[in-house]
Design a protein with these regions (language model features):
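Charged/polar positions within long, soluble alpha-helices
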Residues: 27, 31-34, 101, 105-108, ...
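An acidic intrinsically disordered interaction segment
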Residues: 54-68, 132-154
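Non-transmembrane, amphipathic alpha-helical segments
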Residues: 7-21, 57-60, 81-84, 88-91, ...
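Alpha-helical oligomerization segments
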Residues: 171-215
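Charged, amphipathic alpha-helical oligomerization/scaffolding segments
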Residues: 17, 21-28, 88-91, 95-98, ...
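Leu/Val/Ala/Ile-rich N-terminal alpha-helices, chiefly Sec-type signal peptides and the beginnings
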Residues: 1-77
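Long amphipathic alpha-helical segments with strong coiled-coil/leucine-zipper propensity
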Residues: 51-130
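Short, charged/polar, low-complexity loop and linker segments
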Residues: 122-123, 152-164
Length: 215
């Protein structure tokens, strides 16, 4: 089986970053579906994380802590503020985690994703950007042919005019695939439902500490 995700030491210390990566992708899906646009640099980082097969740390997957700052803030908003948090983002986050769990049992699909991601990396080198339309179309195809075959589907809600756009649909599928990549990394780091139940304060503390480093 081709494992397209690196495994790092000190798993428990880095799971918060990986979870932030999941929520960052989910928040970008929300932005695009509702507004037809999103934070471009953050989008580039999330897609880039999917294409980075070798990294020295979880932070390095996102190009450093700054690359997942939006995700860390989104994570804190969900855990700390029940009034302002956007449940649509949480729904996408949970959906991605469910898909990743089902994917983990399918070595054939993991192999297919790994091969497809390597092809997307080659396309990135050819076209010069991880967010080139052809690269995004390839990533969307990977999602549809693998994760899209499960009975469980993530239903994205938003403005129909934006959702009907082929380019936007490709971006959304690519982001969901990036979210699944982060969810797999999160699980490798010991992430799971019990974390939310018994270690929320620890997650908040870690996220705040990471954000403090960025000041």
């Amino acid at each position: 089986m081709l494992n397209f995700l690196p495994f790092f030491k000190n798993a428990s210390e880095e799971s918060t970053l990986a979870l932030a990566g999941v929520m960052q992708a989910a928040d970008l899906v929300r932005q695009l579906a509702r507004n037809g646009k999103m934070d471009t640099p953050v989008f580039q980082t999330s897609i880039g994380s999917l294409l980075k097969l070798e990294a020295d740390s979880t932070a390095d997957v996102y190009g450093g802590l700054a690359g997942v700052e939006t995700g860390l803030n989104t994570l804190l908003l969900y855990l700390n503020n029940t009034q302002q948090r956007d449940m649509e983002v949480m729904r996408y986050t949970l959906g991605v985690i469910i898909l990743e769990k089902r994917l983990s049992r399918r070595e054939d699909l993991l192999d297919a994703i790994g091969i497809g991601v390597e092809q997307a990396i080659y396309q990135t080198e050819v076209f010069g950007s991880p967010t080139h339309a052809n690269v995004l179309a390839k990533l969307a195809e990977i999602y549809s042919q693998t994760l899209g075959t499960f009975n469980y589907r993530i239903h994205v809600h938003g403005n129909p005019n934006y959702l009907q756009s082929t380019d936007n649909a490709n971006k959304i599928r690519a982001l969901l695939l990036a979210g699944v990549r982060s969810a797999m990394l999160w699980r490798q780091k010991g992430g799971g439902r019990l974390q939310f139940l018994f270690h929320r304060r620890t997650i908040v503390s870690q996220a705040e500490a990471y954000l403090h480093q960025l000041k």
